[in-house]
Amino acid sequence: MSSTDSVVAGQAKVSTWRKTDTRWVLGLFGTAIGAGVLFFPISAGIGGLLPIIFMLILAFPIAFFCHRALARLCLSGRSISDNITDTVDQHFGHVGGVVITFLYFFAICPLLWIYGVTITNTFIAFWQHQLLLPAINRGVVALAILLVMAFFIYFGKDLMVKVMGYLVFPFITCLVLISLSLIPYWTSDIFTSFDMHSLSLFGSHGILVTVWLGIAIMVFSFNFSPIVSSFVVSKREEYEADFGREYTEQKCAKIISRASVLMVVVVMFFAFSCLFTLSPQDMAQAKQQNIPILSYLANHFSSLGSGKSTYATVLEYGASIIALVAIFKSFFGHYLGTLEGLNGLIIKFGYHGEKSQAPMKKLNMISMVIIMGSTWVIAYINPNILDLIGAMGAPIIAALLCLLPMYAVWRVPALAKYKGKASNYFVTIIGLLTILNIVYQLM
C-alpha cells in the first residue's frame, strides 16, 4: 500500500463514528434524564409562554457549552487515565483537590435531600389521591421510605446498580410516551391567556426574573457532569494514542453535542406537552404543593371524576408510578455519590488520606446513618423543592460545571488556547446567574 493510500485509510478510520460513541451519547443522555426533569416543566411553565420560549432557545447552548468546558478541563490531565480529581490536583495542588472534594460532596448531598423530600411528597400524593386512603404522618412516611431504601442499598447494592441501569431507558421511553399521550388533552389556554399588554420585563414576576430562575433549574435538569470525567477517560483511552489529543477533544465535543440535542428535544417536548395540557396557574399550584409534575398530572386526571376515560385513568396511575420509580432511581444514584464524597472527606481528614487504613465497612455504616438521618430531617421539614434547587443544588453544580473550567482556562497553561472564546463568556455568565439565585432566595 502506498503512503497516500495509508493516509486515506487513516482518515477514513478517523472519520468513522463508532458504536462506543453512540453508547456514550446514550449514556450521557441517560445520566441527565432523571427526577430533576420532573420539576423543569413547573419552573419553565409557571411564567407562561414567552419565558419557556426563551428557555428553549437557551437550552442547547447551556447543555453543550457547559459540559464541553468541563470535558476540556478533564482532557488537560497529563495521563490518559487521569480523572477530574487527578487533573485538579495537577493544576491546583493538594489544596485544590481538597476544595474539589468539598464541592463534590456539597454538590451531590443537597440533591439527595431534594429527592428525599420529593419521594416523600410523591408517595403521600399517591396514597391520598390515587389510593384514596386517609392522610398519614409525613415523618413516619419519610422514615419508612428511607429505611426500606437503606435496607436495599446496604444489602443489595450491586443488584440495585444493575436494576437502575436497566431502568434508565424505560424511564426515558415512558417520558416520551407520556408527552405524546398528553396531546389529546392539549388546549389553547396558554395562547388565549397570552396578553402582550400585561407582560413586564422586570419585577418579581417579570420575564427576565422568570428566565433567570429557570436557568438554575435548567442547569440542574440538563446535568450529566457526574459522568463527564469517566466519559473523557474512556475516550482518551480509545482515541488519543492513535489520533492525538486534539482529535479526541473534537470527538468528545461531537458526542456531547449529540447527547445535548437528544436531551433538549426530549425534555423540552415534555415541558411543552405539560404546559399545553395544564396552565401557568396549575404550574403555580404544583410548586405550592411541592410535588413533581407527573404527580400533579396524576392528581389532575384524578379530579376529572367519573367522566374520565380509561385512557385518563391509565395516565393517572401510570404518571404516579413512573414518578416514584424515577425519583428512586435518582435517589439511589445520588446516594452512592454522596456516600463516596462523605467517605472521601472522612478519609482525607480522619485518616490523612490513607484509604487502606480506613475500616470501610464501619465507615459505610456511619456515613449511611449521617446521610439518611439528615435526609429524613429535611424530608420532614418539607422545604420547597424548586427553592431548594435554586438555593443549593444548582449553584454548586454551576460552580463545578461552569466556573471551575473557566477559572482553569484563565489559570492553567494547558488550557490557554481556549482563552478569549465567546463560549467562555456565555458559560461564565450562566454560572454566575445560577449562583446568584442564592441571593434571590434570601431576599
Curated annotation (Swiss-Prot):
Gene Ontology cellular component annotations, sorted alphabetically: plasma membrane
User: What domain of life does the UniProt record list for this protein's source?
Assistant: Bacteria
Location comes to: Cell inner membrane
Please write the reaction equations for the catalytic activity of this protein. L-threonine(in) + H(+)(in) = L-threonine(out) + H(+)(out); L-serine(in) + H(+)(in) = L-serine(out) + H(+)(out)
| Membrane-related topology note | Multi-pass membrane protein
Q: Which UniProt keywords apply?
A: Amino-acid transport, Cell inner membrane, Cell membrane, Membrane, Symport, Transmembrane, Transmembrane helix, Transport
Protein name in the entry = Threonine/serine transporter TdcC
Natural source organism: Edwardsiella tarda
